[in-house]
Amino acid sequence: MNNPSETSKPSMESGDGNTGTQTNGLDFQKQPVPVGGAISTAQAQAFLGHLHQVQLAGTSLQAAAQSLNVQSKSNEESGDSQQPSQPSQQPSVQAAIPQTQLMLAGGQITGLTLTPAQQQLLLQQAQAQAQLLAAAVQQHSASQQHSAAGATISASAATPMTQIPLSQPIQIAQDLQQLQQLQQQNLNLQQFVLVHPTTNLQPAQFIISQTPQGQQGLLQAQNLLTQLPQQSQANLLQSQPSITLTSQPATPTRTIAATPIQTLPQSQSTPKRIDTPSLEEPSDLEELEQFAKTFKQRRIKLGFTQGDVGLAMGKLYGNDFSQTTISRFEALNLSFKNMCKLKPLLEKWLNDAENLSSDSSLSSPSALNSPGIEGLSRRRKKRTSIETNIRVALEKSFLENQKPTSEEITMIADQLNMEKEVIRVWFCNRRQKEKRINPPSSGGTSSSPIKAIFPSPTSLVATTPSLVTSSAATTLTVSPVLPLTSAAVTNLSVTGTSDTTSNNTATVISTAPPASSAVTSPSLSPSPSASASTSEASSASETSTTQTTSTPLSSPLGTSQVMVTASGLQTAAAAALQGAAQLPANASLAAMAAAAGLNPSLMAPSQFAAGGALLSLNPGTLSGALSPALMSNSTLATIQALASGGSLPITSLDATGNLVFANAGGAPNIVTAPLFLNPQNLSLLTSNPVSLVSAAAASAGNSAPVASLHATSTSAESIQNSLFTVASASGAASTTTTASKAQ
């Protein structure tokens, strides 16, 4: 710790006017005294006075030397706490000078930052003090009068400097020569620069130059810095940019150039700074934030997703990163350490991606398929736009088949000149849209029960394929249609009980898809004699709709006639016509009309379509069966009603598609309600709503039994099935049995 050259800098820092202080330069005020190569007697006296004020108030230089030794030892102990391995060896007589210098250098422990001009001035002042100290030691060793001379100097120090006489002249040249000799003898001592105590320093972190000149020492220290590991130097320059190399250019002794290095545990192993000073972190965070923002903008401009970046980095650099990691990096949600780790990799990938995107070879198939480029070339797929005409064709295909097979999708794609994957995705999306529009719970299937179209106070029983019979006077029960795949003639029974009412109601029932309301009747009021139900019996695309209504008539219904024209149904073997008359399968229309008890003049045979049949359902023959020979082949058609007695001619209802019940108004026991099935006017029964209109023309005071109409329209593989039944009852309940031929 003995430092003959270092003492020159802090020695003048204790030269202030504070007379009572004995600290090691901690409380001081610099008072630079301009001196040249030689000093005057007055300046020497002033320096001695300042030194006397700092050290002690005695009158003897011997006592001063002793106090200097004590303070220098305490300073050495404080200095050894930071640098414990420093030697302090000096001769007993010559130890006073370096010890005193080291004591005076205590003011530098606080690491004051001095300008070059201040350093030069302190060096000059230190030289002058060193000369005075050398002369004092020489005089002390020569004679015992040294004490008296010291007392004279200390006494004269209190007087103004202009009036101080020097009792013993000091030979400046000899003193300088002696000082140089002493310094040359102490060249083997280590010399250090004391810096701020908050800086953690280690002895191995000082760089000592052995050149005698200050400027050469500075250059040597810079050369030594360049020989440090590159990682440590990067840490040094980043963590301590304000630390500069210091030197003592004016001293002829060894100069010191020391640069403290911030202690970093991982500075030798990783090129990234883990623990950085708090003053430098904001700039690094700002740099990372700016890079993250720039990276996101450039990535989007290139058309890559965050997942593409992670995949490409895994293929190119061997480090797989997820989309979440890239997203958190762009949002600055990663730790500082991970951000620093990702930044160089992302920066490298970004540069490579930009270079590849700008390269013309990227557009060639060979470049796209080359290793390492796959991750970079995978761009975000654009949204497919489908033209209107193609969309209409797809909608039509969807209505036909909602879930086509792979082969059907391929055929559709070839027809529309579209990609198969696009067609497949469109069908998937369209099915999801259909589920949102029509949830599965709202649609009926073959296993769904019969649902009431409108609420009614009368009890409506949802039936199964078995026969359901109700004995209540105000209840109408309907059995649903049997499965449409049945080929045998089956008897279906519709049972109703008659009742009397005092008013007439007009009922309108429109057939419609089962999912929607199929009853529109502003004049229909829920009554004991009116009810409706719908049964949905479907297999694949088959649909069956059953509608039942009861309309009161003003007079007893004596005879009902049904005329059926069908040109598409295949006849099946069944029982012959029973009751009033039995006809062969090839009976003519006139014979059938006569057997039915219908006047041929009411409906001429020429009005019947080819293969038509006229049926008679008398109250006495309601238990009979209809021969399938009376029902020829025809598609489903609309129902028209003809008024008895010619009040409504047949031709007047050809274009309306309505079924009209009307009273004859004449003899109550002779009422006919013929039904005419016209295939030309009623060919859209299963696709468009068809009305069944019931109207009464009699007075409101007449009483009449209830006539029940059971109309069932089915849509099977092709629209070819129909079943129409009219049941009337007078008095007791009777059963009407009809035959239905189903494909």
Curated annotation (Swiss-Prot):
UniProt xrefs under PROSITE patterns: HOMEOBOX_1, HOMEOBOX_2, POU_1, POU_2, POU_3
User: Which residue intervals are the DNA-binding region?
Assistant: 379-438
On this chain, the residues bearing Phosphoserine are: 283, 385, 448
Keyword Nucleotide-binding in record:
no
Q: Name one GO molecular function term.
A: identical protein binding
> Per the database record, which ranges form the POU-specific domain?
280-354
State if Transcription regulation is listed as a keyword: yes
Listed GO CC annotations: chromatin; endoplasmic reticulum; intracellular membrane-bounded organelle; nucleoplasm; nucleus; RNA polymerase II transcription regulator complex
User: What are the record keywords, sorted?
Assistant: Activator, DNA-binding, Homeobox, Nucleus, Phosphoprotein, Transcription, Transcription regulation
Q: For bias kind Low complexity, which ranges apply? A: 81-95, 357-371, 505-557
Q: Polar residues: which segments have biased composition?
A: 1-11, 494-504
The entry's localization annotation reads:
Nucleus
Q: List residues modified as Phosphothreonine.
A: 270, 276
Give the GO biological process terms: negative regulation of DNA-templated transcription; positive regulation of miRNA transcription; positive regulation of transcription by RNA polymerase II; regulation of transcription by RNA polymerase II
Q: List the disulfide bonds.
A: none
**Residues covered by region (Disordered):** 1-34, 67-95, 258-283, 357-381, 494-557
Cited SMART domains: HOX (SM00389), POU (SM00352)
Q: What does the entry's PTM section describe?
A: Phosphorylated by PRKDC.
Q: What does this protein do?
A: Transcription factor that binds to the octamer motif (5'-ATTTGCAT-3') and activates the promoters of the genes for some small nuclear RNAs (snRNA) and of genes such as those for histone H2B and immunoglobulins. Modulates transcription transactivation by NR3C1, AR and PGR.
What does the annotation say about its assembly with partners? Interacts with POU2AF1; the interaction increases POU2F1 transactivation activity. Interacts with NR3C1, AR, PGR and HCFC1. (Microbial infection) Associates with the herpes simplex virus VP16-induced complex; binding to HCFC1 activates the viral transcriptional activator VP16 for association with POU2F1, to form a multiprotein-DNA complex responsible for activating transcription of the viral immediate early genes.
Q: What is this protein called?
A: POU domain, class 2, transcription factor 1
Please tell me the species this chain comes from. Homo sapiens
